[in-house]
Amino acid sequence: MIRKNSYKIFWLAGESSADLHSELVMKALNDKFGNLTHIGIGGPRMQRQGLKPIFPFDKFAVMGFVEVVKHLIFFFKVQIRLSKLFSTEKFDLAILVDYPGLNLRIAKMADEMRIPVLYFICPQFWAWKHNRVYQLRDSVRYVACILPFEEELLKIHNINCSYIGHPIAEEITFELDRDSFARFFGLDSSKKWIGFFPGSRNNEITKMLPVFLQAAKKWNQNEYQILFSKSHNVNHQLYMHLIEGQKDIIIIDGYNYEMMKYCELLVCTSGTVTLEAAYIGTPLVICYKASYLSYLIGRKFVRIKRIGLPNIVLDSDLLPELIQGEMNPANIYKAGMQILTDPEMNTKIRKELFKLRAMLSNKHPSIEMPKIVRHLFETYG
């Protein structure tokens, strides 16, 4: 039974994917509980649902060990500010979304100040930094898992948790059919389309886009048309500078899901976009390249052999993964053409991706999260 008429929730979502995944959840919470106050860190989507931001969202978009080290002073200031905020504001709940490098520290801080913590999108302790599972156990009241296998792993450590479905099952919609998409962007419908997704962070774009552009040149322009996604989170001037002088490519700004659906093949930087593409059902090549130091440090601690989320969820080497030195134009073209020209391989990939879709869509976060929040309000409110 809900005991109060209004509740105050602290949020921390440090990345664009977390901002996206939190939007529908916030809307569902607002619809369910009505009088909620949302304060914290989040992007434009969360702000549309009523979040009052306390830091510029774009300051948090860093990736890799070296990049994080460069921003240590900023993150130290964030922790000081949040410590003061927690001591002055009466929060009924803290919802921390992914972003474990900072969020696990904030979870400990909130717990020490008697603010119950709900962790939405579990840290990938099963991949690396296994000690994070103990941080979850000590500081977090409940973990909402978005990958099917995480619930069982957490319960081994006596952590309150449940699998709530993956947010992409609710987020992915299509506004344009193939012909409308082609007309909107001036595409040649008679050709096969190959789509490149170089990333949603500036440092990703700097590393991945030049390699992807070189790979794109290898495809026969008479048979294939090359599409490049441009994330709204990426600095426009940086992106345009990197593609300056490139011919025979079409930049797709927005309509990512249509691009994924209507392309014959996708080449994607490792991340949420690979799971979105796999959920939609289009075969893809997964690529990843970090700074050399970040890669060396990461390789020492990573506990799994796969980096692509679709392969991890399926526990399979279904989709080709090109990492660091292997991520070069020749290998991208070779892996992509193998998928395009081998009907048996192509069919197998599509069948397995259909299974993945079923695994991720049997529950919905916008339905499950309000149940969890209600339970926490009733227990700790």
Q: What spans do the regions from the language model cover?
A:
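Nucleotide-activated sugar donor-binding and catalytic core shared by glycosyltransferases
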Residues: 1-381
